[in-house]
Each structure stands twice: as C-alpha cells, then as structure tokens.
C-alpha cells in the first residue's frame, strides 16, 4: 500500500505490457506479521482489494484478446478480500503460479462444483454422514480466515446433515494480516479448537 499500488502499479503494468517476453506477472498483496512495526496495513478492506482488481482487469482483457493469455495474475487474496468471484480457470493460463497462491481458489471452486454434480461421488459422503449421525460424532474442518467463507459455502452444500463445521483459525503466532491456511501453526489450532473434542473428528489442512 502506498508503495506499488495506484499510479505506481499502473506504471509496473505498463512496463510489463511493453515487454512481451515477460510471460506471467504475479500481483500479490503485502503480507506482514506482528513481529515488526514498519507495516500496519495492506489490502484487507474490500474496497481497496477491489480497486486493485479493477486496475489490473483492462490489462488482462487486452492481453487475452491479443495473445490468448492473461499474463497479469492477481493473488487469490484480492478476490477473497473483495468477496468477489475469481476469474475462470482458462484465465489462469495453466496455473503457472499456483503455488504462489494464484489460482488455488478457482481450482478449489471448480473441483467442488464437479464433486457436487457427481451423484456417484456424493454417495460415500452421504454414507459417512449417516455413520457420523449413528455414532453421535461430528467433523471439524480447520481453515485459515482468508478462505473460510469459501470452504463454508462448499461444506453447506454437502449432504452431511449438519455434521461438518468449519473452524476459522486466527493466526496469532504470526499476527499482522497473515490469514492464509498454509501459514497456520499448531499452537493456534490447538488454542482455538473446542476444549472438548470427544466424539469429534478434526480434519487438518494438508499444508500448514
């Protein structure tokens, strides 16, 4: 914020637009922890995140029209913070920056939609929900705060009869604006899960 956004971001986008050999540009919001005092804000307000999306969009559209590729890729955090739908999978150009947090949400949404439309795949989920009900058990699914609403929407669409609940864990260890699932720490998960976990199955992210 106030460094490489606004007019400065536009200059960066213009610089890349004039250099076609740059095949993919990642635009990522500043992340900061509580263990410093230089930075105190980023793009966590919806309006500020949306402003970046709006600034980059014309460049994406022009490049797709000219070359069939997007090139200018916004980190998932911008769409999550603006509470807006990310672009379709095609616009991620094969997800070259997936592990930089660019396109993970779109990939998840598409996989979730495929699962929810597949009656055969939903069968085992219904069966598992019935077993949980018979045993008086529930599932707690751990998520970071940034993507918790996306995961909640998915879980609410599953035929699990209210047996699955999403727990959005605040990142107190790093603090600041760190809120992605991949940077969760065990100390925060343990501190924020219910003390009584009897008859409870806890599902942890595979990366944290």
Please report, for each region that a protein language model flagged, where it lies by residue.
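Conserved C-terminal portion of the radical SAM core fold
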Residues: 1-38, 47-77
